[in-house]
UniProtKB/Swiss-Prot annotation:
<comment type="similarity">
    <text>Belongs to the ThiI family.</text>
</comment>
<dbReference type="Pfam" id="PF22025">
    <property type="entry name" value="ThiI_fer"/>
</dbReference>
<feature type="binding site">
    <location>
        <position position="296"/>
    </location>
    <ligand>
        <name>ATP</name>
    </ligand>
</feature>
<protein>
    <recommendedName>
        <fullName>Probable tRNA sulfurtransferase</fullName>
        <ecNumber>2.8.1.4</ecNumber>
    </recommendedName>
</protein>
<keyword id="KW-0547">Nucleotide-binding</keyword>
<feature type="domain" description="THUMP">
    <location>
        <begin position="60"/>
        <end position="165"/>
    </location>
</feature>
<keyword id="KW-0820">tRNA-binding</keyword>
<dbReference type="GO" id="GO:0002937">
    <property type="term" value="P:tRNA 4-thiouridine biosynthesis"/>
</dbReference>
<dbReference type="InterPro" id="IPR014729">
    <property type="entry name" value="Rossmann-like_a/b/a_fold"/>
</dbReference>
<dbReference type="InterPro" id="IPR004114">
    <property type="entry name" value="THUMP_dom"/>
</dbReference>
<keyword id="KW-0067">ATP-binding</keyword>
<keyword id="KW-0694">RNA-binding</keyword>
<dbReference type="GO" id="GO:0140741">
    <property type="term" value="F:tRNA-uracil-4 sulfurtransferase activity"/>
</dbReference>
<dbReference type="InterPro" id="IPR020536">
    <property type="entry name" value="ThiI_AANH"/>
</dbReference>
<keyword id="KW-0808">Transferase</keyword>
<feature type="binding site">
    <location>
        <begin position="208"/>
        <end position="209"/>
    </location>
    <ligand>
        <name>ATP</name>
    </ligand>
</feature>
<feature type="binding site">
    <location>
        <position position="287"/>
    </location>
    <ligand>
        <name>ATP</name>
    </ligand>
</feature>
Amino acid sequence: MEFDRMLIRYGELSTKGKNRKQFVTKLAQNVKRAMTDLPEVRIHGERDRMYIILNGADYQLAEERLKPIFGIQSFSPAVRVNLDVEEVKAAALALVQDAHEENGTFKVAARRSHREFPLDSNEINQEIGAYVLQNMEDLTVNVKNPDVKLTIDVRKEGVFLSCRTILGAAGLPVGSSGRAMLMLSGGIDSPVAGYLAQKRGVEIEAVHFHSPPYTSEQAKQKAIDLAAKLAKYSGQVQMHIVPFTEIQEVIKQQIPESVIMTVTRRMMLRITDELRRKRNGLAIVNGESLGQVASQTLESMLAINAVTATPIIRPVVSMDKNEIIQIAQKIDTYNLSVQPFEDCCTIFTPPSPKTKPKLDKIEHYESFTDFDALIAKALDNIETISVNVAETAQVKDEFADLF
């Protein structure tokens, strides 16, 4: 069957009242980004649904692009015919023949919003159903639990027919809740945190700390590949790669071993927060899970968070590791995350890090080093790349060129 469009039904957008238009616009933008390799498609958004006009594009490829996009409750491959009963009959028969299995069951579910069509909803159900039955001997009607449900939507602009409903990713369109910076390591937790933030409409920009020669190019590429996995939910993710070697070396030389990790995380957070400010972000997202490691106790979080007043969103904070792993497997980041390339969070890790660091002592230790200058230098040399849904990354520019 040759489908000519995809019919998209909204999720939580239906509850957004006066803000509905901006949600629909954001969803349309995300769909367009996801369809960059299908330039022939056209997107038409309405108040209660959206259409993707395929113009000859492969509907199965379009279907795969739509599945991960947040803000879509469900969607259906569909065909449009003129407001003519005979055309509706022909299209209905072709759709059911394509979708049914031997000795299967079906039902017709019609809705008529265009009152000038000669049949009302019940008459459409009866006439189209009878026509299909007359032309398919091995088919029977089951109105409660059919194998094939033929939906017919009669509108002023035409009649739309479909036989299959595919569940979407639900949630809110990415970007509808503002922008945040995702602290993206090469581990399991932070990509899951990024995924969950996107599901609630947050546009993420990834921040990755790279410390050559202690961390390899493979570790950097792994982080880029993880960002590409997240890009499929919005079409594109901006990624900022921070040169962090010098700061880590100074921390190792100047800071007591037991609090190296606390100070390291504080410097990461300061850099991320400055990036957030320059990029007009509203929050910082990370993959911290309470009590999982020494830097993720409440006492450690308090000492680390003291460097900023920016909201820190921790989507996985209450999850067990197995729960996080299950989501990582679902979104296809787990196998990447467990690749054995060391990232900057694991180098220089002391054997017995403090789990209850004191903020006043941390600030005292830091006072002997000009970390402001080191942070400014790192910010001046950030590399920014654009990671898109097709899992390609291109160097966009140096960070200084953005401002």
